[in-house]
Structures are given as C-alpha cells and as structure tokens.
Amino acid sequence: MQVTEINAQGLKREFQVLLAAQELEERLTNELSGMKDKVQLKGFRPGKVPVAHLRKVYGRSVMAEVVQNAVNEANRQIVTDNGLKLALEPQVEFPTDQAEVEKALDAKGDLAFKVALEVMPSFELADLSDVSLTKLVAKPSDAEVDEALDRMAGQSRPFTEREEGAEAQSGDRVTIDFVGRIDGEEFQGGKGEGIDLELGSGSFIPGFEDQLVGAKVGDKRLVKVTFPESYGAEHLAGKDAEFDVTVTKIQAAGEAKIDDEFAKSMGMESLEKLREAVSEAIGRDFEAASRRRLKKELLDALDGKYAFELPPSLVAQEFAAVWAQVEQDLKTRGKTFEDEDTTEEKAQAEYRKIAERRVRLGLVLAQVGESADIKVSDEEVNQALIARVRQFPGQEQQVWDFYRKNAQALAELRAPLFEEKVVDHVLGQVKLVEEPVSKEALFADEDGDDTTGGKPADKAEAKDESKTEAKAD
C-alpha cells in the first residue's frame, strides 16, 4: 500500500492511496484461504474446498471486504504516521470510472482512492496570570427566607368547602369538568373531569379563570379564550377556543400558620430548623447563580485569549444545531425575523459567530483538560446517570438501560462533568475578587448561555442551555 499526501491547506489534508493489483490479489487469496476451514460447500469435504473454487463463488463479496479493510488500514496509517487529530471522520473518494473499479475488484488492475481529512488545530495554551475575575456573592436575607416560607405555606394552606350557594372568589379552589372545542370540534387534550383549579393562580389559559369567578356549584359556563401564540402545542397556538365548564365543588383557602407545627409538617424539628434549611437552599441557589456568572466571565476571558483556525465541519455542525433552535423558537412564538428587527441573513451571520465561539471554547477547554490530565471517573458518571434517572419517575429502568446501551448518550452525561472540572482548574489559574451583591444584582442579565456571551440584542433567542462541549477522553 502506497500513501502519498497530495494536498495540505489549513486544517484540510488529502492523501492518495494506491493498492497495486498484486497486493489486491495477495489480500484476496489470504482471505479466501482463511475461509477454507469454515465454509461448507456441497461436493467438498470440510477444509478441502479449493481456493480457486471459493474465489469463483465468493470472490466479489470477499474482495469488497478486502477493499474496506484496506481503507480502514490506510486511514489508521495516515493518522498514526502523521500524528493527526481528526475533527471529522475521513472522507474516502473512489474512482468514478466503473471499468477501472471492476478491474481492481477482479485484482487485474490497481486501485487508487483519495482520503480527505479535516484535522484539529494546533495551538499553545495562553498565560492566564493577568486575568482577574469578579465572583458575585449574595447571602440570603431574613426577608428572602420569610418570602420563601410564605410561598411554602401558600402551597400547603388548607381548603374547606364553601357553604351551599356560595359564589367562587379569586383564591378559591374550584373543581371542574370541561370540554373544549375549536371551530365546534373537540380537540386532543381539551377534556377534563374532576380537575382542581385555584382561581387567580394563572395555571390555565389567560382569561379562563377570570370567567369562573362568581360561579356556583352546579353552574355550567361557556368560557371563551384564545390560546397564546407561544403555546407549547403548535396545533393550538393562537387559536380561539370555547370550553363548556361545569363547577362541581368550591373550596375556600384557609390560613397556614408558619410555626413549629408547620415546620413539623415539612419534616423539620422546629421552625428554627426549617428556617435554617430554607436559608441553606436559597444559599445554594445563589451559589449556583454566582457560578454561572463567574463561568460566563471566565469563558469571555478565554475567548479573548485565543484566535486560531476552526475546523469547518465542527462549526457547521454547531451552527446547524443553533440555527435549528432559533427557527424553532421563532415558530413557537409565532414570530418572523422582521418582527425581531433583523433579517435571516443578518441573524445567520450573528449565530454563526456564536457557533464559532462555542467550537473555539470547546477546543480550548478540551486541550486544557488534556494538558492537566483531567479525568471523569466511572463513579462520577454513574452518579450523574442516577440523578438523570430520578428525573423520570416510573421509567427508571428504561432510562437506565437507554444510557447504558447508548455510548453517545453516556458521553453527553460525561461531557459537562469534564467541563466543570476544567473550569475549576482554570479558575485556579486566575485572580478572583469577591464582590458582595444583592439578590437582584446577582440574577440580573442571566439570559443567554455561557458559551455565547448572551443572546444577540433584538434577535430571536436561542433556547439552548447546553454549555461548551469539551471532550472528555
């Protein structure tokens, strides 16, 4: 096998591989000889089938395997001999002349094919000693703890049935049966029986709850609403609907006292212990928000430190994913690019920059992780898998089996674990300055994802919450 590099431009490399007819003949003969003891043909004793006869029966199919094995071998040799890291699977191009291919498959002519590669860029890791980042620190106040307790109490407050003939008021819980119709036809998901609804909670379609205020048990009301343009079910978004609603029960909300008894109902020893637990939970939320802000600032700093050629295939893949989210977002919200004060061409240019940033940061974090020998243990992946499984009650075994049988899905669990370890490592190389802030300041401007630097102003918002996909080896 003769391998010759015929083109090298940037991250693109191209090689020509030549398999001489004699080599094809030898490879085919070796494969057929190895089949003698395995093949049983009528008229021949086991292991006694002549190679010439095997060639007549299986020659073409075995030669196809020979060529495929040679292609795989050539790819490995090219990568190993040239010390390449591939960004894309090798693209193999065979001759277009069918007669030439036929001769090669009969081992009567040479076979030449091309292998096109796209390689990862080579770059030096930047010195981060001059980078200074601000970590925002917020501590839960007594008022924030009180607010959280009030919400908990509101969700736990008792309801008592109103007296006969009483009218439903805002804040009451009504039990209803309903049938919805659009253009006179019932629609999927538009029917319910014995459904509890707290009036004023905003849990139903806008305007639905308001039309039940003043209703009595046994009342039948025709509720007219319009589904929001952003409604999750696309076949209902923006549609006018009518619901025949029957009120079967009305309950008034009582008061839930925030005291030791309330704390015990929440599984805590006392109100003091409950306040401590709530404060700790809020503190964890604050710390997570602080981490997101700090990570965003770190990635911005890293992005400003690097400028190198990016593999076009990786950028194209990332852009396709980002753009699909943009289009889905516009469709869900019933908007156009004109509504967002832009054009499709301008939006594509801006989101391509986002894709490039993500790819660049992914490559940087991957190289940092490799340089620092950062690993993600199987135990850490298992813990992440267990956490994911718990998100699907009743389907735990199916979810577990899916991830265990799907290497790509498991890799997607491993990637963010690897990334967070790399981020921790990089944070250890920069100067951190803590700045006490309020809750409002901590959570301000949290739109956009960490790798993009936020959504472009006045553009359709990309909903992707995934972070830079640094690759874990």
Curated annotation (Swiss-Prot):
SUPFAM superfamilies: FKBP-like, Triger factor/SurA peptide-binding domain-like, Trigger factor ribosome-binding domain. One of its GO terms (molecular function) is ribosome binding. Consists of 3 domains; the N-terminus binds the ribosome, the middle domain has PPIase activity, while the C-terminus has intrinsic chaperone activity on its own. It is found in: Cytoplasm. Residues 439-473 are annotated as: Disordered. It catalyses: [protein]-peptidylproline (omega=180) = [protein]-peptidylproline (omega=0). Residues 171-256 form the PPIase FKBP-type domain. Involved in protein export. Acts as a chaperone by maintaining the newly synthesized protein in an open conformation. Functions as a peptidyl-prolyl cis-trans isomerase. It comes from Methylobacterium radiotolerans (strain ATCC 27329 / DSM 1819 / JCM 2831 / NBRC 15690 / NCIMB 10815 / 0-1). This is Trigger factor. PROSITE patterns: FKBP_PPIASE (PS50059). HAMAP family: Trigger_factor_Tig. GO terms for cellular component: cytoplasm. The keyword Hydrolase does not apply.
